[in-house]
Every structure is written in structure tokens, then in C-alpha cells.
Amino acid sequence: MFVRTAGERDLDAIRAVLVETWHATYDAIYGAAKVTEITDEWHSIASLKARLIKPNSDFLVADDGKRIGGVAFAESIDGGKLVVLRQLYVLPSLQGRGIGGMLLDEIIESFPEAQAIRLEVEAQNTRAIAFYEANGFVRSGDTGERTGTFGEPTLVYRRPLAG
């Protein structure tokens, strides 16, 4: 797999990665119907297309030349000092092979002036939490409000960068 910038031709494959990964991660916890409702809204082609042109952001895919195996999207805020990782997903069948780390490294390299990277993660997504902690993220709090994907507080993680 190699990491590259996502393009409009990738949108169907990106959506497929997101839908499959979300169902694999959340169906047992929240139910397939709720997950489908969310992926239909958040991962629609129109929503994904808007991310391609969002200023101060980077949208990446992990590609082996035959298929998209992972996606990542992040944007900088606070004058470029902070990167917010909005999405990092790898197909379940490809997890544990370093693809997530490759995507994360490339996201960080895309924002050389950033001093930190921040993300929010569902408290029940223990696999993602373990991944982020193994990659230097430290829990810095939670949203404190029922704003998460499923109406629950999300955990906030942060990692300092060289900047």
C-alpha cells in the first residue's frame, strides 16, 4: 500500500471503506440500522466530495493499485497550529498491517507547522483507542456533552508535534 492524496475518482471506494469499517466497528454496539443512517449522511458522495476541496485540509487514501484499503482526513485550525484528525479508517481485513500508521504519518507530514494533533474517539471503540495510544496520543479529556456519533460524549486525545 502507498499513501496518496484522494481524488474525485476515489469517492465510491472511499465510501465503501467507510461503510464497511463503520459497520464492523459499531453494529454490535449500536445496531446496523443506526450505523447505516449515520454512514448514509456522513459518508455520502456529496459529503466526501466537499472534503476534497475544504481549505486547510488533507484527504488521503492508502492504495495498493487495485483497491483503496484506508482513508484519512484532517484539517488545521488555530492558524495552522493544531491539526484535527477527523477520520482515519482502514478496512477490517487490512487492520494490523501498518496502514493506519502510514496514513497517520502522512497526515502529520502534511501539516509541518502544526504543534499538536487532536482527535475525538468513541469511548467504546477500544481498538482505535489502543491504536492512538500506541502512536503517542494521550487522553486529554472528553467532549463533556452528548455530541458523539451516537449521542454520547467522545474521548479527546492529543499528541504534541515538532511544529
Model-identified regions with their sequence ranges:
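Extreme N-terminal starter segment of soluble prokaryotic enzymes
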Residues: 1-3
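Intrinsic disorder/low-complexity detector
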Residues: 12, 65-66, 127, 137
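A structural feature recognizing the 12-helix transmembrane core of secondary solute carriers
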Residues: 99-111, 116-117, 124, 128
